[in-house]
């Protein structure tokens, strides 16, 4: 019996035809590249000098500036030839030389020539002057550009469409007339720029004046939007920028960058990462190892003076709020207090529609004495400044977690859980003339809200401060343990203590106690 042959289906015939068509296109492309490669090596390279006018005209169209080439030569070695240009001059509107490049080496390929570009562009010993004028316009080697002219900047689009750009041994002078800053001259400037269709990777290294510090590097990895391939406008890019300063005088950066704080002094090493979205910095992280720091963190605040500080700090913008954190941050105050290197993460978002403002705080190893010492120099708000001044806290917060709703100045709801050792609080006055008790030498495990809370209290070689209870307000204690609860009702406060066991030089015993503010007012 003869079995009938299976005839190919319409789908199989379509797939086979598509495969043949794709193979033909691929072969045609390879043939085109082979012809272009042969023309490049066999016709263009030997006659490169004859193409100088065309190269000048094409460069002028790409950059939007007149271009003159002093001399040109080419070598055909390997698959990709190299073309050397000497004394390349960019001219201003009056025909004067605005920028002179002593030596430029380009490596074209058939693929790059289809886009009127190069596989690699090498620039040696350029001398560049960049100036931001008082009206905000940028002048590069005497050629003026608007800061907002990135949408149709032909020179930038061409530069960021090249496969690789290398600058070696350059010199850069930056003058900011808008800020009134002194000129900054950078020597031995090296730049490496690699571009893909949507990717832009760059590396910048330079040596500043000796008073600024040592040689530093900047590294960036950015991507353009999906529908903006080879977009030269950096205001559309997103990615990350990394800076590495092995030794820098931070106070000098304030003349050229908005740091958000006034830094009068500070020297040491800084490594920083900045997150960028559509050309705007939205967050960042910095590793610090600085000495002799003198900074003012806000208006009407005292200067913060730290003989030394090291650790990691970071933050980012949130919708209507912010996030700030530290990791292993250690510092010493000018009064000799030492911050022990704890971690902190603070997040606060503003009100949006019917949702109120809210926040979250997590921290460990917080030195309350150091915090009280520098509290007036930190932007904590009037309520926190007043509390630190009134209660002068001491002790180590082993861990704390706090959440809240409402503005920081007038919290609507809050919840706090924490453990503190070596706690000391001064007695403080409340509204209506009442006074809160104080304590010293305490270890506390606490949970509290705006309506009240509870705490496990243990005191060793400490005491209680009870204004108005005894003739001598300070009650010394060798040992004390207690379970404490309290309730808050507006200005009124009620406290109950159970399972209280105590001993001192005069007495020992167990008791239950309660205390409350008066009902006056």
What is the predicted function of each stretch?
Residues 2-63, 128:
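N-terminal type II signal-anchor transmembrane helix
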């Amino acid at each position: 019996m003869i079995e009938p042959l299976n005839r190919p289906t319409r789908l199989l015939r379509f797939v086979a035809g598509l495969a043949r068509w794709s193979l033909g296109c691929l072969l045609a492309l390879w043939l085109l590249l082979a012809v272009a490669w042969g023309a490049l090596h066999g016709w263009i390279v030997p006659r490169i000098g004859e193409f100088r006018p065309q190269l000048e005209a094409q460069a002028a169209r790409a950059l939007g500036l007149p271009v003159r080439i002093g001399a040109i030569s080419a070598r055909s070695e390997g698959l990709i030839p190299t073309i050397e240009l000497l004394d390349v001059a960019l001219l201003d509107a009056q025909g004067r030389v605005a920028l002179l490049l002593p030596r430029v080496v380009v490596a074209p390929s058939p693929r790059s020539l289809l886009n009127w570009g190069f596989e690699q562009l090498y620039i040696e010993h350029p001398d560049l002057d960049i100036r931001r004028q008082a009206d905000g316009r940028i002048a590069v080697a005497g050629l003026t550009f608007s800061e907002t002219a990135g949408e149709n900047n032909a020179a930038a689009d061409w530069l960021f469409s090249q496969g690789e750009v290398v600058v070696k041994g350059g010199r850069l002078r930056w003058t900011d007339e808008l800020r009134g800053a002194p000129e900054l001259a950078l020597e031995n400037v090296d730049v490496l720029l690699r571009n893909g269709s949507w990717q832009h990777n760059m590396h910048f290294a330079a040596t500043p004046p000796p008073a600024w510090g040592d040689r530093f590097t900047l590294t960036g990895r950015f991507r353009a939007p999906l529908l903006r391939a080879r977009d030269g406008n950096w205001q559309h890019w997103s990615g990350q920028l990394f800076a590495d300063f092995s030794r820098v005088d931070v106070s000098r950066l304030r003349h050229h960058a908005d740091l958000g704080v006034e830094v009068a002094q500070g020297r040491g090493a800084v490594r920083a990462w900045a997150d960028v979205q559509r050309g705007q910095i939205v967050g960042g992280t910095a590793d610090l190892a600085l000495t002799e720091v003198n900074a003012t963190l806000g208006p009407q605040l005292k200067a913060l003076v730290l003989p030394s500080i090291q650790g990691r700090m970071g933050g980012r913008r949130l919708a209507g709020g912010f996030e700030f954190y530290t990791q292993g941050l250690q510092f010493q105050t000018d009064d000799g207090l030492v911050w022990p290197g704890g971690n902190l993460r603070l997040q606060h978002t503003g009100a949006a529609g019917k949702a109120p403002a809210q926040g979250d705080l997590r921290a460990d190893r917080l030195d309350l004495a150091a915090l009280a010492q520098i509290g007036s120099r930190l932007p904590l708000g009037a309520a926190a400044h007043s509390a630190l001044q009134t209660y002068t806290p001491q002790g180590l917060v082993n861990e704390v977690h706090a959440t809240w709703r409402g503005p920081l100045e007038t919290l609507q709801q809050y919840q706090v859980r924490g453990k503190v050792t070596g706690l000391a609080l001064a007695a403080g006055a409340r509204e209506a003339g009442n006074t809160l008790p104080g304590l010293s030498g305490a270890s506390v495990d606490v949970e509290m809200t705006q309506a009240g809370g509870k705490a496990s209290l243990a005191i060793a070689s400490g005491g209680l401060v009870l204004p108005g209870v005894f003739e001598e307000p300070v009650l010394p204690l060798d040992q004390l343990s207690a379970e404490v609860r309290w309730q808050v009702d507006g200005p009124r406060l009620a406290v109950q203590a159970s399972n209280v066991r105590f001993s001192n030089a005069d007495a020992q015993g167990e008791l239950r106690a309660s205390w409350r503010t008066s009902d006056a007012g």
